[in-house]
Design a protein with these regions (language model features):
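Conserved helicase C-terminal RecA-like lobe
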Residues: 4-19, 23, 32, 39-181
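Conserved RecA-like helicase motor core of SF1/SF2 enzymes
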Residues: 27-28
Length: 183
């Protein structure tokens, strides 16, 4: 294939056929940084208790939430038996304006994405997700071919989302809403 984004179609076909495969000189589509980031936004939008997704995207794109703030969030979560989301919410209410504003911006982005999850077709959901999250702009700023390739991969993820319901059973409106799939 000529573009890394095109590998997704081939990989999906191989996976559906349940054939073992190995990629030489590259990374599997769903293992790529930008794809994992986008899927983590989707996971957190559907379940804000998902600590792995939270950790992956809390500062992607950069919001000024550093290691010190993450350590505070983890400690607060551990001490109060909270999810990282819950601990970050608590920290945002009890911290200085810089940390508080950065966390509130993050919550706002995830909340906007979450509200779309039940009201959009899955393709439209992912299209909006890559824009609202800032991932498309963030990766588009990477220099040269690397940035272009990452943006193409995000666009391919949107196309892949359109195909989630075109295979197998009849797709109806209820089934094509994100709230009914497991990411």
């Amino acid at each position: 294939y000529r573009s890394n984004a095109q590998s997704r179609i081939l990989e999906d076909s191989i996976l559906r056929a349940d054939l073992p495969y190995r990629i030489y000189g590259g990374v599997r589509f769903y293992e790529r940084l930008e794809i994992k980031n986008a899927l983590s936004y989707a996971k957190l939008a559907v379940d804000n208790q998902n600590d792995a997704a939270f950790e992956r995207i809390i500062n992607v794109p950069s919001r000024g939430i550093g290691a010190k703030t993450m350590d505070q969030i983890r400690e607060l979560a551990r001490e109060n038996t909270l999810s990282l989301w819950g601990a970050a919410k608590k920290l945002s209410d009890n911290s200085g304006p810089k940390v508080s504003n950065a966390l509130k911006e993050f919550f706002s982005v995830v909340d906007k994405i979450s509200k779309m999850a039940n009201n959009k077709e899955i393709e439209e959901f992912f299209e909006k997700l890559v824009d609202l999250s800032g991932l498309k702009e963030f990766h588009g700023k990477e220099p040269g071919e690397k940035g272009r390739s990452r943006v193409e991969n995000l666009e391919e993820l949107v196309s892949a989302a359109a195909g989630f319901f075109s295979i197998g059973e009849d797709a109806d409106d209820e089934r094509s809403q994100l709230s009914l799939i497991h990411i």
